[in-house]
Amino acid sequence: MSQNRPAAFNTLRMGEVIREKVQDGITGETRDLQYTQCKIVGNGSFGVVFQTKLSPSNEDAAIKRVLQDKRFKNRELQIMRIVRHPNIVQLKAFYYSNGERKDEVYLNLVQEFVPETVYRASRFFNKMKTTMPILEVKLYIYQLFRALAYIHSQGICHRDIKPQNLLLDPTTGILKLCDFGSAKILVENEPNVSYICSRYYRAPELIFGATNYTTKIDVWSTGCVMAELMLGQPLFPGESGIDQLVEIIKVLGTPTREQIRTMNPNYMEHKFPQIKPHPFNRVLRKADNNAIDLIARLLEYTPTERLGAIDAMVHPFFDDLRNPSTKLPDSRHQTGQVRDLPPLFDFNRHELSIAPQLNHQLVPPHVRPTLAAQGLDIDHFTPMRKEDMLARLD
C-alpha cells in the first residue's frame, strides 16, 4: 500500500513524479504507474478529484480519492470494473493509500480525464443569454441514453444522473457518464434507500420515499436534464422534497390515486391539492413536437409508463443524429470548424441484444455494412441471453 498521504498531492513540486503500485482497472493485474502535476478539479462529501499527467505518456488522467470503509467492499470500484462502454468514463487503474490518521485508508480510482461537463456547457450558453443548440441537446441526451441502456441491461442503476456527472469532450462532442459512487445493482424485492439522487433530478417515487424503485429513476432524471438544457434552468427546482413535489405537480398536475399507488402505495389516502397539468408545449415554448413528445414520455408519474433508455434512443427526436449528412457546428467559436458527429452507432453484441426487435430502428442503414463486417449482421443476429447480460459482483 502506498505511503503517500493525501497531502502529497498538494505539495508536489513541478516535474516531481509519484510512483504507485496499482491494479489494472480491467484485469486487476499489478503494475507500476507514474504521474506528475496534480491539481484539484473537484471535491465533495465523497472525497477529492485530481487532474494528473501520467508519465512517461504525458496522458491526462483523473484520480478520484475516497475514504475506504475497511468493513465493506467499495461498490463504486466493483461496478467501474464491470462497465466498459464508449459513453462511460473508463477506469484505468486503482490503488490504496494511507491517510493522515493511522486508521485511514483511501481508495484511488485512476480514470480517463475528460475536460468539460454538460453543467459547464449549459452555464456557458446561459452567460451568452441563449440556450444550448438543439442538435447538441440531441447529441448529449442520446449518448446518455446509450450509456443508461447498457448499464440498465446489466441491472445497474446509476442513481445520480445530473449535468455535473456528464463529462464532455467539447472538441469531439463525446459524452461520458461518470461518478458511480451512488450506483447499485438493483435486485427485485430487495429494498433500496430512497434518499439518493440530487435534488431537481429526483424521480417522484423517491420523493415519496419508495424503496422498491427501478432503473426508471435514471430515465426521469434524464428527462429533467433534457428539459433543463432546453430551458436554460432546472425544470423542477426546490430546496426540499415537498418543494420539488409542488414544482412537479405544477407541470404534470396532481397524480391520480392509481399513479400514487405505482410510486408508493402508503400515500394513496393522502390528500393533495387538485391542480390541472400545464402542457409541456407551454413550459418549453421553443421545443418542437418531437421534443415535447419525448419529454412527456420520460416525465411520467408511473415508472412503468416511462420509456426505457433503449426505447428513448429510437425516438424520432434523435432522427437528425441518424442522418449521415448531419454535421456538428462549433457553437462556442464564431469561426469554429463544422465537424462530423462522434461515433454513435458503434454498437457491440451486448448493446444489440438489449432489444433486438428495435435494431433496425437503432442502426441507421449507412452503418449496417460496418457492423456486418465486424460479424454483427442485424438481419441474422443471435442476441445474448438476458441473464448473461446481468452484472455479477465478486
UniProtKB/Swiss-Prot annotation:
Annotated organism of origin: Pyricularia oryzae (strain 70-15 / ATCC MYA-4617 / FGSC 8958)
Induction info: Expression is regulated by MPS1 MAP kinase, particularly under stress conditions.
Keyword Ligase: no
Pfam families with a match to the protein in the record: Pkinase (PF00069)
CDD domains recorded: STKc_GSK3 (cd14137)
Cited InterPro entries: GSK-3 (IPR050591), Kinase-like_dom_sf (IPR011009), Prot_kinase_dom (IPR000719), Protein_kinase_ATP_BS (IPR017441), Ser/Thr_kinase_AS (IPR008271), STKc_GSK3 (IPR039192)
Keywords, in A-Z order: ATP-binding, Cytoplasm, Germination, Kinase, Nucleotide-binding, Serine/threonine-protein kinase, Stress response, Transferase, Virulence
UniProt GO MF annotations: ATP binding; protein serine kinase activity; protein serine/threonine kinase activity; protein serine/threonine/tyrosine kinase activity; protein tyrosine kinase activity
Residues noted as binding ATP in the record, renumbered to the chain: 41-49, 64
Cellular location(s): Cytoplasm
Any single GO BP term: positive regulation of kinetochore assembly
Domain of life: Eukaryota
Name recorded for this polypeptide: Glycogen synthase kinase 1
Keyword Cell membrane set for record: no
Cellular component terms (Gene Ontology): cytoplasm; nucleus
Annotated Protein kinase domain residues: 35-318
UniProt family annotation: Belongs to the protein kinase superfamily. CMGC Ser/Thr protein kinase family. GSK-3 subfamily.
